[in-house]
Amino acid sequence: SPYRPEVYADQIKDAKPGFEIMQGVNINVTNDIEKGLIPIKQNLALYIGGMGAKSKNFHTDLMARMGFEAEAHQIQDLFLEGRRNEAIAAVPSQFADEISLVGPIERVRDRLDAWRDSPITSLMVSAGSREQLQQVAELVLD
């Protein structure tokens, strides 16, 4: 997240000049932000809930370090109990929104500034369609 530099500041404090920092970001250009966050939440529930052992899951730990500890453990518990739809519903919209670029193109453009102002040097973009990828490319390349 470009909004929580304290989460990764220690890991990059000794980076050499020119060190590249890449981050994946999902993009969904839509007028319905909540609906646009659904695929993001589905993906997050899988990673937070099911990637790794219950006692050691990088994604659960990262979400906790980002200030969503109770939610991270709830998602993991629900997912591991086979209650995947409930795990998806337990992903906070605030969290999903903070680590993605979802909404009308104007909102996506405005929120790109937070990434530009962060230590991230390159975004690895995933979009739902070629058209959305083209829209975002035009924003970035302007």
Predicted regions mapped to residue ranges:
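Active-site-adjacent structural elements that line small-molecule/cofactor binding pockets in enzymes
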Residues: 1-142
